[in-house]
A protein has these predicted regions:
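Core segments of transmembrane alpha-helices
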Residues: 669-673, 738-750
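Membrane-helix interface and helix-disruption motif detector
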Residues: 688, 758-765
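Generic alpha-helical transmembrane segments
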Residues: 700, 704-705, 746, 768-782
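Membrane-water interface at loop-to-transmembrane-helix junctions
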Residues: 724-744, 764-769
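A C-terminal functional module that forms or caps the active site or interfaces directly
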Residues: 785
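Conserved cytosolic headpiece of P-type ATPases
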Residues: 1-719, 728-731, 756, 771, ...
Length: 871
């Protein structure tokens, strides 16, 4: 891809290099170049067929193991002429999970398509010396384009001639203000936002008129570079997917190891080969929580609904949990931390500093100047014009001091003068009014106005005014100076009378400081990345609590000097990055991730898209966000507010906590089943049938597991900085201990029950009672999992009404299974009632004992892993 340094070349050089001139290309030459360079559109990633996408859903160890189990079960059922129910149920589970995953993947981003929509428009070009309108996809290097206010720039181009040209480049740079452009020569190296003689594809012309020569099209444009980044970015697994994959791998390896041991032991004992195979299949069914994928999918769907109520729209389901695992939130400034509305905040006039709330008297000339030096139009409550002028217009309107003054002439703002002036008539007298930067205005003033009296401007007075500007600028205010003349108005910008200052800013959202404080208490680092100046970025960051000193801020220029290894260390100490390009933003995200952080990135412009896609969770803006960003993002903020991100993190942490409870609930029971199936092989007795295990895993376990998703947040959820720390595993020491130790104890108890009733009655009765025990245990254990650390034996044990109802329904279904004709598939008939009561009684005793020993677990084992990285 070409390095675009056309801004360093003079127009004449470009004419020669591009073999063109002011009359444009000939139609013949344009056709040749179209064939050489191709259409002016972005390349697209080769798409996979739906069939291939669906097949990829089976590329998982756990799924493969289940398929093998189903196939072997079907073969044995065929040989032994038995029912295929087990095989069919397993395959149905596999297909349902694959279908859900397929639907999710089909929602994948279409960002490149959205970028290409920016090229579906028309532009006016000069060809053969004549103006014509063509499809922008036919534009080639060397074309001369005419641009006017409202036009979409379709290629990177050098300005030949312009008049009051302003371009909004926020899609590329993040700079919210329109940039003034002109045909100037630039010899030194400049950042994208400093290239005043260029216009770029994907940007909008907001004011003025220009002729430009096209230098780059399609993938060679700055927009094309962003498109290339989007195509090159790999869709990495989310934290949740990594954690679930780890569970799959661990379970698969354990199952394979145990099956091998079972086969060896069984063959050494000269057991029937088909019996060994059936036990192996039973083991696979017992070990794999078949319903886990479906349950997690349902939980995440419920989480998506809850987040939507809090103005967070989740596009990619796994991102629900990722948001709760976030370590660092990289936020844009404009519109997210701030309101994205410039507002007048300070007024300096008559030697006094006022706020926008004050009612100020005796300032007619000040009001005349403000009313005159703006070009805002209002249409159906919509304000059109430069954002600073809109802020002034609204201020005048709110104070009811907007004055309609006849205008004779206007001297538009330009980057050399840094001023705009108007000639107006007031009561038959001609005035000139000027608005601009303090440097430019004050150096052209000879007098200042105070209480309708004129005074000579002295050096001391200038120092005083510059001091006021410095103090106000430190508050993130943009300061403009005002002046006027009543004599020699044909030369309006010299020998003027200084009136005062007006300060404007895009203020922080009221909710942001509290939200940032909540993040800090939660161990989440806030990083602000903006296209604005370092001074503005620092001031806003200080005002909302992101940084306390200037040392926490840096610029894109400084970052670009660092190697990747140096940047990896540098990102640990900076919280504010100003004047950041898309490529630098991508490097910052990569550096943060290389330190082991889970990174959330917000953005609204096309320039943000690569970094949003690269981040662990990309957050797009619902109001100001481009369609490109919305397609790339994992979630979208309906109201664009930073505090909404924190609401999303809070909800994500609740869901993460509940998923841990569900993992405990499902795996603890499955490990018990694995141990008992293995023991049954050693004892040469069948404790469980495959159908019983499927019933427990799919029916008894699934509904309570889903209902655990409705557990409410805990009071310390956003204060607990370590328990929610991201690891590639759910298995904290506490969770592992509860699963393993608990499973061993439960297996011993159940083995004793089995042996006792095998002697007291028979093996089949003992197996049936074991089935009843395990079902009862799973229902009681669902209540225990509501709180991993503390006992649930209190008045709140039934406070999760959905869980209570779910358990009650399963209990009813279980009773129906035991007393109707279908019971023959699960238990032997005519079991003595006292056997059942003894079994259930033991289960309740074990449940109570399990709750009583929870404090011992909590004391001995941590609910987090030690982490090395620091925030």
């Amino acid at each position: 891809m070409k390095e675009n340094n056309y801004y360093n070349k003079k127009v004449e050089e470009l004419y020669k290099e591009l073999n063109t001139n002011i009359s444009g290309l000939t139609e013949e030459e344009a056709s040749k170049r179209l064939e050489e360079y191709g259409e002016n559109k972005l390349a697209e990633r080769k798409k996979k067929s739906n069939f291939i996408i669906f097949l990829n859903q089976f590329n998982d160890l756990m799924i493969i193991l289940l398929i093998f189990a189903a196939v072997f079960s079907a073969v044995i059922s065929y040989i032994q002429k038995e029912s295929y129910a087990d095989s069919i149920i397993i395959l149905i589970i596999v297909v349902i999970n694959a279908t859900l995953s397929f639907i999710e993947e089909k929602k994948a981003d279409k960002a490149i398509e959205e970028l290409n929509k920016m090229f579906i428009t028309n532009n006016n070009v000069i060809r053969d010396g004549k103006k014509e309108t063509i499809d922008v996809r036919k534009i080639v290097p060397g074309d001369i384009i005419e641009l006017e206010a409202g036009d979409y720039v379709s290629a990177d181009a050098r300005i030949i001639a312009s008049e009051a040209l302003e371009v909004n480049e926020s899609t590329l740079t993040g700079e919210s203000k329109s940039i003034k452009k002109d045909n100037i020569d630039i010899t030194e190296e400049k950042e994208l936002y400093e290239r005043k003689n260029m216009v770029y594809a994907g940007c909008n012309v907001t004011n003025g008129h220009a002729f430009v020569v096209v230098c780059s099209t399609a993938m060679d444009t700055e927009l094309g570079k962003i498109g290339a980044s989007l195509m090159n970015n790999k869709n990495e697994l989310t934290p949740l997917q990594k954690k679930v994959n780890q569970i799959s791998k661990v379970l698969t390896y354990i199952i394979i190891a145990i099956i091998i041991v079972m086969m060896v032991v069984g063959l050494l004992k000269k057991n029937d080969f088909f019996d060994i195979l059936m036990l192996s299949i039973s083991l696979a069914v017992a070990a794999i929580p078949e319903g886990m994928s479906s349950v997690i999918t349902i939980i995440l769907s419920l989480g998506m609904s809850e987040m939507a109520k809090r103005n967070v729209i989740i596009r990619k389901m796994a991102s629900v949990e990722t948001l709760g695992s976030t370590d660092i939130i990289c936020s844009d400034k404009t519109g997210t931390i701030t309101e994205n509305k410039m507002q007048v905040k300070s007024i300096y006039v008559n030697n006094k500093l006022y706020t926008e709330k004050d009612n100020i008297e005796n300032i007619n000339l000040y009001n005349y100047c403000l009313s005159s030096c703006q070009n805002v139009t209002k249409n159906n409550d919509k304000y059109l014009g430069d954002e600073t002028e809109v802020a002034i217009y609204k201020y005048l309107e709110e104070k009811n001091i907007l004055i309609n003054i006849p205008r004779v002439k206007e001297y538009p703002f330009d980057s050399d003068r840094k001023m705009m002036s108007t000639i107006n008539t007031i009561e038959g007298k001609e005035y000139s009014f000027t608005k601009g930067s303090l440097d430019s205005v004050l150096q052209n003033c000879s007098y200042y106005l105070e209480d309708n009296k004129l005074y000579n401007i002295t050096t001391e007075y200038k120092e005083k005014i510059f001091k006021i500007e410095e103090e106000e600028s430190e508050k993130s205010l943009r300061i403009l100076a005002l002046a006027y003349k009543t004599e020699n108005t044909s030369d309006p910008e010299h020998n003027m009378i200084f009136i005062g200052l007006i300060g404007m800013m895009d203020p922080p959202r009221i909710s942001v400081p509290n939200a940032i404080n909540t993040c800090k208490n939660s161990g989440i680092k806030i990083v602000m990345i903006t296209g604005d100046s370092i001074n503005t970025a620092r001031a806003i960051a200080k005002s909302v609590g992101i940084i306390d000193t200037d040392e926490g801020a840096t610029t894109g220029k400084e970052i670009d000097k660092l190697t990747d290894d140096e940047l990896k260390e540098a990102v640990k100490k900076y919280n504010v990055y100003a004047r950041i390009s898309p490529s630098t933003k991508l490097r910052i995200v990569d550096a943060l991730q290389s330190n082991g952080y889970v990174v959330a990135m917000t953005g609204d412009g096309v320039n943000d898209a690569p970094a949003i896609q690269k981040a662990d969770i990309g957050i797009g803006m619902g109001i100001t966000g481009t369609e490109v960003v919305k397609k790339v993002a994992d979630c979208i903020l309906v109201d664009d507010s930073f505090s909404t991100i924190v609401d999303g993190v809070e909800e994500g942490r609740r869901i993460t906590s509940n998923i841990k409870k569900i993992i405990l609930y499902l795996l603890a029971g499955n490990i018990v089943e694995v141990l008992l199936v293995f023991i049954s092989m050693v004892l040469n007795m069948e404790m469980f049938t495959t159908l019983q295990l499927l019933w427990i895993n799919l029916v008894t376990d699934s509904i309570p597991a889903i209902m655990l998703a409705f557990e409410k947040k805990t009071e310390d959820q956003m204060e607990n900085t370590l328990a929610n720390k991201y690891n590639e595993s759910f298995f904290t020491p506490l969770l592992t201990a509860k699963i393993v130790i608990g499973a061993i104890i439960k297996s011993i108890v159940m083995l004793i029950i089995f042996i006792y009733f095998a002697k007291e009655a028979d093996v089949n009765t003992a197996g049936s009672l074991l089935f009843i025990y395990l079902v009862t245990h799973e229902l009681l254990f669902s209540f225990s999992c509501r709180n991993i650390k503390k006992s649930v034996l209190n008045k709140d044990i039934f406070s999760n009404k959905k869980l209570t109802l779910g358990v009650f329904l399963i209990l009813l279904v279980q009773i129906i299974v035991l007393v109707t004709p279908i019971s023959k598939y699960f238990i032997v008939p005519n079991i003595k009632i006292n056997y059942i009561l003894i079994t259930i009684g033991i289960c309740f005793i074990m449940f109570v004992l399990g709750e009583l020993v929870k404090p011992i677990y909590t004391k001995l084992f941590k609910d987090y892993r030690e982490v090395k990285n620091e925030k």
